[in-house]
Amino acid sequence: MVYAVLTGDIVGSSRVEGKAHLELNTSLKRSFELVKDTYRDAHSLPSFDIFRGDSFQGVLDNAIYALEASLLIRAHLRKDQVADQQSDWDARIAIGIGEIDYLPDNVSEGDGPAYRSSGPVLDRLKKETKLEIQTPWQEINDELSTECALLDAVIAGWTPSQAEA
């Protein structure tokens, strides 16, 4: 079975303080619930964990939904951002596509090629890059890299109202 592992972190979370930080964390959790609700009817059971305060990892048992799930998370964060914050709420997300050798209840403890590609990809993302997909196939990775860069450019211009639409 081909899985998608989404590994991400909140962009600029250290600059979000007090009540706004709690609201940001709540928004992230609600975005995970949105993903779960969206794919429940597709017989897919997404699962997510938050760790280190602003990092997260999720698994989709059908990789076809990975890009859309990432967009749902990012759009939800941008929609919920607090107006007086100096930075937009957003997430950097690395998607690893592949097999999983071990999938426990706590998804951040899993292992396999999909896990081992998503973590290092997140670590390599540049400041302006917020989405990257890694598959076992280099030609597809090259194509997806270009498409993710274009998608990042579009998302960067979203207002909260546009993200909600």
Regions found by a protein language model. Name each.
Residues M1-A165:
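Regulatory and interdomain segments flanking nucleotide-handling catalytic cores
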